[in-house]
Each structure stands twice: as C-alpha cells, then as structure tokens.
Amino acid sequence: MSKKLGFIGCGNMGKAMIHGVMASGKAQASDILASAKTESSREKNAAELGIRLTADNKSVAEFADILFLAVKPQYYEEVIAEIKDTVSDDEIIVSIAPGKSLSWFDEMFGRSLKVIRTMPNTPAMVGEGMMGVCANERVSQEELDTVLDLCSGFSKAEVIDEKLMDVVTAVSGSSPAYVFMFIEAMADAAVAGGMPRSQAYTFAAQAVLGSAKMVLETGKHPGELKDMVCSPAGTTIQAVRVLEEKGMRSSVFEAMMKCLDISRKM
C-alpha cells in the first residue's frame, strides 16, 4: 500500500519535491495532498502538478502518513502550532528547515514524534539535488529508508550525524548561490570578450557541470584535476594565479564559515 504524502507549502522546494516523487513513479497524484496560502498558488500548482491542494494545513496533516514541512523556517512555529494536535503519533514529519534541531520539534509539538530532518537544495528542481538527512530515535530504519527512497526522486541523499547538518547548509544547501555567482561572473567576462550573453551562460554553466561530474566520477582530487588543465606557461595557470592573488579560496572559505555560523544561531 502506497504512503499518503502531505506537503505543507508548495513553493519552489515543495513543488520540486512533489514533481520529483511523481516523475520517478514513487507516488501518484492521488497519494498527495498539499497546502498553499493563496488561491492563485493553489490553482497554478493544481494545473501544473495535477494534485489536490487546500488552504487548510490541518487537513494535510490529517491526510498524510509522511508530512513534509515545506515552508520557510520563519513559518515553522506558526505551522506547528496549527497542526500539532492533528498530527498522529505514527505520522512521519520531514523538515527541510536549517537550524531546527530534532529536539526543537519535541519542544514545539509538546511530545516526541517521528521526525526526519533534511537539508535539501534548489538543484532538486532539476532532479540534481543534494541533501543531508538525520532522524530521531522514534524513526525506524524501514521508515527512514522509505523517506530516503522518496527523496531519491529529486535528490541524492546521505544520512549524517545531526551535528553536521549546519555544515550541510553551508556546503550544499546555500552553495548553489555561490556557484551561480561564479557562472555569472564567467559569463560576464565572456561577454566582455565579445561572446553573446546567451551563449556565454551556456559555456560557463556547462563547464561547471562537466567539472563537477569529473570530481564525482573520476575519484580524483580536485587539485589533481586542476593540475591536468594547467599546462606549463599556459593560459590556465595564469588565470589560476590571478584567482589565488584575489583570494578566491579564502573568500569561499570565509563565506561558508559565515553561513555555518548563522545556521547554528537559527
């Protein structure tokens, strides 16, 4: 028997998750009920996804075997206050919020429930997400495996210790923004060199995509792969020299440490 999935929130991340579980055949439209605040959002998502939507978060919580809290972190307390008396003890709660610990959910719900904490990222929208996952002691291995299987429809996922979840926020949750800035900067330089902008974005983005695949598929250290591109007295090593002079490594390092610090304080 298929699990009934509830999604409180149907913004970019909620929509990406719903699309992923349906496109991968892990859930049917009849298995899903989602909520959205505005009528226009409900109508739009119903048309795009073919699922049922409601304005009532309680009805989603009552419907679901697995309940995804797909709203922004600042709305979690409000949503939990609304649904806490509706959620059953057997229901699995899946959080996508940074900075909300497993113990925090016990405090907010006023009792210990089955909670799985995740940190997804926006590449889930194209089926290439990366997420960290941890669960409390009430979640069985079978239940965790079920959620991991669902998430595999839109993201790669790894189970980690909860103390590393804030690191996940910095290294994969927020990092698409850093990568987009890098792609944009490369494209700007290409445009300055005379390339049409649309073509510049394609060249820059594909270079990043291909480079990432080389790291994942070759097993080689990124430094070794970098060295393979840098010919003696060539163009690439001069570009690398400028990036080192301008502090590219330290800028990325410090930005991620700031992100990590903010996540820990949330």
List PLM regions with ranges:
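NAD(P)+-binding Rossmann beta1-loop-alpha1 motif at the extreme N-terminus of oxidoreductases
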Residues: M1-A55, V191-A192
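Small-residue helix-packing motif on alpha-helices
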Residues: I32, R42, V60, P196-A204, ...
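Rossmann-like NAD(P)(H) cofactor-binding subdomain of soluble oxidoreductases
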Residues: E39, L49, N57-E62, I66-V133, ...
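Short acidic-hydrophobic, aromatic-tinged amphipathic segments that line or gate anion-handling sites
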Residues: R52-N57, E158-I160
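Internal alpha-helical scaffold of NAD(P)-dependent oxidoreductase catalytic cores
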Residues: W104-K114, M130-V167, F180-E217, I262
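A short glycine-threonine-serine/GTX helix/turn-capping micro-motif
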Residues: V168-A177, S198, K226
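NAD(P)-dependent Rossmann-like dehydrogenase/reductase catalytic/cofactor-binding core
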Residues: A205-M266
